[in-house]
Curated annotation (Swiss-Prot):
Induction description: Up-regulated by thyroid hormone (at protein level).
Gene: HADHA
Catalytic function, reaction form: a (3S)-3-hydroxyacyl-CoA = a (2E)-enoyl-CoA + H2O; a 4-saturated-(3S)-3-hydroxyacyl-CoA = a (3E)-enoyl-CoA + H2O; (3S)-hydroxyoctanoyl-CoA = (2E)-octenoyl-CoA + H2O; (3S)-3-hydroxydodecanoyl-CoA = (2E)-dodecenoyl-CoA + H2O
Keywords, sorted A to Z: Acetylation, Disease variant, Fatty acid metabolism, Lipid metabolism, Lyase, Membrane, Methylation, Mitochondrion, Mitochondrion inner membrane, Multifunctional enzyme, NAD, Oxidoreductase, Phosphoprotein, Transferase, Transit peptide
Function per UniProt: Mitochondrial trifunctional enzyme catalyzes the last three of the four reactions of the mitochondrial beta-oxidation pathway. The mitochondrial beta-oxidation pathway is the major energy-producing process in tissues and is performed through four consecutive reactions breaking down fatty acids into acetyl-CoA. Among the enzymes involved in this pathway, the trifunctional enzyme exhibits specificity for long-chain fatty acids.
Gene3D superfamilies: 1.10.1040.50, 2-enoyl-CoA Hydratase, Chain A, domain 1, NAD(P)-binding Rossmann-like Domain
Residue(s) carrying Phosphoserine: S316, S419, S650, S756
Site residues (Important for hydroxyacyl-coenzyme A dehydrogenase activity), renumbered to this chain: H498
Name of the protein in question: Trifunctional enzyme subunit alpha, mitochondrial
């Protein structure tokens, strides 16, 4: 039973839902400081209870930095030494954030394994003192309690949390290629059981406060307060503090017991884990699952299992030592550096570098109720934007509105929304067949078919009815925005907003500016994207922009590899084993063969031989036979509703046979096939930076990983060049250039990096 539970919870772990870590917005307010010399921690005494307030300066979140560690140790030593203090409360002064985890910059600054290991051991010592405190300590949790923050909280004798959506607890270290390094791998299994602890540590998922209480991670819940004389956030923190003080006094007076009664299932699970055979089966099954899903690309999950196992089998001392050692090893790996780089990139791409727009977008209109248009509508109404969804036909409009409702209803099924909240959000959407109400629109996003003449027509129609300040954004994936804006009376108000499908799940938004796009238009587009919860890259206009331009040459190589006789299943296996979340052949089916054909033709005309490779006739014949991919039920594979397993489409055999190419043995090993795909992608990405399409390598990495599925463990194309080596990539390209020609010619910037070993995209 225990093994089944462990396998069940790990089934949600895929390689890799990387870096979906949340960014929590926290508003600072000032608390009185006991000592002016302290900048991160202050405390006051209420009766015989010390209230320790955490407040990292100049930051929206509290992070466990060296400075905070030092001040926290100093404060706690004063509390333990005082005869007037009998208990303590730990609370944050920042609404929406208890402690968000360790300071990643502190970890990134470490140059040696020994430095990182020492950081872990120091954190373990501080947290152990909390756990062994003779004076009861209550953690009062409001907002994000993640990583090291959770490790601090579970070492306290009691935990109280606000029952609020912003209050989440979790161990996201695995998403950064690391593991909990302050004793979490040892305390968490004892607190919630081994299966639940492994689930938290291996997936990095966050748990809401009500769920945390059921698990035993939290002892009491406090309802958040509404508005009053003070803002709701401030009132809630004050109330949480009052409740925590009451419980701290009760613990000191022995009127409240810190021990929690466990349920029958927990007791049975705990008993089962005392049986050596059961434990070994759990370890074995979990390790098998992890190996299958990570494909050996991410070292952290297996080391987490190893550390947990060490603590259970050899005792806590051995477990803590193993934890600090493995923590040090992991933080120094290329995978961890790549994932931490992506985290920093996300932070960068969640800021509006254009500043605040002159006018907030409150009313949005979307043209086209297809898959993309409806998806954009969903992420807009979900964030409170009044949205018009327009289409030319009632059938398409109804289908689009149903898609939005279904997306919201799925959240109800997952208990992320109530039915009332769903209906309230859905009421923000208005579906219509005409332009009524567009005179109030602040922004119009067109999501019509990829046809320039059609986009010109709707742009002219829209400009006849929208107000002067209204922005026109095109959700094109490849057509140059300047060509779309050519018929506009106000080209400074035209911009590209390239969303990715499915819109409600894909994090990336690629914003495209032309030479005529105004700064305020850019600021408004970024502001809308951020409100929709997107990670945003801003690129210059050009055929294919950045993401489509990187994907197109790789897809051309996919076609050539298929023509050379590699079957789609093997090609998928080779690409996923390299770290791509979706196989290359499956990706064509998911994107749509007709879309791939359209992009290949358009970009092929612009870039010529350099974008060549496979014969696009393959895609043309597939489209003529109706093999459009998943949406038509057939592509390279056959798709059936409700059936996960997909078989090869045998009707493709004749098409592939008619276009078969002889493979070149010197460049056809499995490794060569992988690198033929990846080097074309990387070379094009670097060329985009060289040409100024991209502003920074960080945006290039974020766009590639979050928009195109470039392997997160490699950190994106630019981080990959730094970690793998520019010279090695150029050598690969030259090898393939000798076999295939200009398609593999290294771009100048990449060659420059190869010729100067000290030259890096990230310093």
């Amino acid at each position: 039973m225990v093994a089944c539970r462990a396998i069940g919870i790990l089934s949600r772990f895929s390689a890799f839902r990387i870096l979906r870590s949340r960014g929590y917005i926290c508003r600072n307010f000032t608390g009185s400081s006991a000592l002016l010399t302290r900048t991160h921690i202050n405390y006051g005494v209420k009766g015989d209870v010390a209230v320790v307030r955490i407040n990292s300066p100049n930051s929206k979140v509290n992070t466990l930095s060296k400075e905070l560690h030092s001040e926290f140790s100093e404060v706690m030593n004063e509390i333990w030494a005082s005869d007037q203090i009998r208990s303590a409360v730990l609370i944050s002064s920042k609404p929406g954030c208890f402690i968000a985890g360790a300071d990643i910059n502190m970890l990134a600054a470490c140059k040696t394994l020994q430095e990182v290991t020492q950081l872990s051991q120091e954190a373990q010592r501080i947290v152990e003192k909390l756990e062994k405190s003779t004076k009861p300590i209550v953690a009062a949790i409001n907002g994000s309690c993640l990583g090291g923050g959770l490790e601090v909280a579970i070492s306290c004798q009691y935990r109280i949390a606000t029952k609020d959506r912003k209050t989440v607890l979790g161990t996201p270290e695995v998403l950064l290629g690391a593991l909990p390094g302050a004793g979490g791998t040892q305390r968490l299994p004892k607190m919630v059981g081994v299966p639940a602890a492994l689930d938290m540590m291996l997936t990095g998922r966050s748990i809401r406060a009500d769920r945390a209480k059921k698990m035993g991670l939290v002892d009491q819940l406090v309802e958040p307060l509404g508005p009053g004389l003070k803002p709701p956030e401030e009132r809630t923190i004050e109330y949480l503090e009052e409740v925590a003080i009451t419980f701290a006094k009760g613990l000191a007076d022995k009127k409240i017991s810190p021990k929690r009664d466990k349920g029958l299932v927990e007791k049975l699970t705990a008993y089962a884990m005392t049986i050596p055979f059961v434990r070994q089966q759990v370890y074995k099954k979990v390790e098998e699952k992890v190996r299958k899903q990570t494909k050996g690309l991410y070292p952290a999950p297996l080391k987490i299992i190893d550390v947990v196992k060490t603590g259970i089998e050899q005792g806590s001392d051995a477990g803590y030592l193993c934890e600090s050692q493995k923590f040090g090893e992991l933080v120094m790996t290329k995978e961890s550096k790549a994932l931490m780089g992506l985290y920093h990139g996300q932070v960068l791409c969640k800021k509006n570098k254009f500043g605040a727009p002159q006018k907030d977008v409150k009313h949005l209109a979307i043209l086209g109720a297809g898959l993309m248009g409806a998806g954009i509508a969903q992420v807009s109404v979900d964030k409170g934007l009044k949205t018009i969804l327009k289409d030319a036909t009632l059938t398409a409009l109804d289908r689009g509105q149903q898609q939005v409702f279904k997306g919201l209803n799925d959240k109800v099924k997952k208990k992320a929304l109530t039915s009332f909240e769903r209906d309230s959000i859905f009421s923000n959407l208005t579906g219509q067949l005409d332009y009524q109400g567009f005179e109030k629109a602040d922004m119009v996003i067109e999501a019509v078919f990829e046809d320039l003449s059609l986009k010109h027509r709707v742009l002219k129609e829209v400009e006849a009815v929208i107000p002067d300040h209204c922005i026109f954004a095109s959700n094109t994936s490849a057509l140059p925005i300047s060509e779309i804006a050519a018929v506009s009376k106000r080209p400074e108000k035209v911009i590209g907003m390239h969303y990715f499908s499915p819109v409600d799940k894909m994090q990336l938004l690629e914003i495209i500016t032309t030479e005529k796009t105004s700064k305020d238009t850019s600021a408004s587009a970024v502001a809308v994207g951020l409100k929709q919860g997107k990670v945003i890259i801003v690129v210059k206009d050009g055929p294919g922009f950045y993401t489509t331009r990187c994907l197109a040459p790789m897809m051309s190589e996919v076609i050539r590899i298929l023509q050379e006789g590699v079957d789609p299943k093997k090609l998928d296996s080779l690409t996923t084993s390299f770290g791509f979340p979706v196989g290359a052949a499956t990706l064509v089916d998911e994107v749509g063969v007709d879309v791939a054909k359209h992009v290949a033709e358009d970009l092929g005309k612009v870039f010529g031989e350099r974008f060549g490779g496979g014969n696009p006739e393959l895609l043309t014949q597939m489209v003529s036979k109706g093999f459009l991919g998943r949406k038509s039920g057939k592509g390279f594979y056959i798709y059936q509703e409700g059936v996960k397993r997909k078989d090869l489409n045998s009707d493709m055999d004749s098409i592939l046979a008619s276009l078969k190419l002889p493979p070149k043995s010197e460049v056809s090993s499995d490794e060569d096939i992988q690198f033929r795909l990846v080097t074309r992608f990387v070379n094009e990405a670097v060329m985009c930076l060289q040409e100024g399409i991209l502003a920074t390598p960080a945006e290039g990495d974020i766009g590639a990983v979050f928009g195109l599925g470039f392997p997160p463990c490699l950190g994106g194309p630019f981080r990959f060049v730094d970690l793998y080596g520019a010279q090695k990539i150029v050598d690969r390209l030259k090898k393939y250039e000798a076999a295939y020609g200009k398609q593999f010619t290294p771009c100048q910037l990449l060659a420059d990096h190869a010729n100067s070993p000290n030259k890096k995209f990230y310093q």
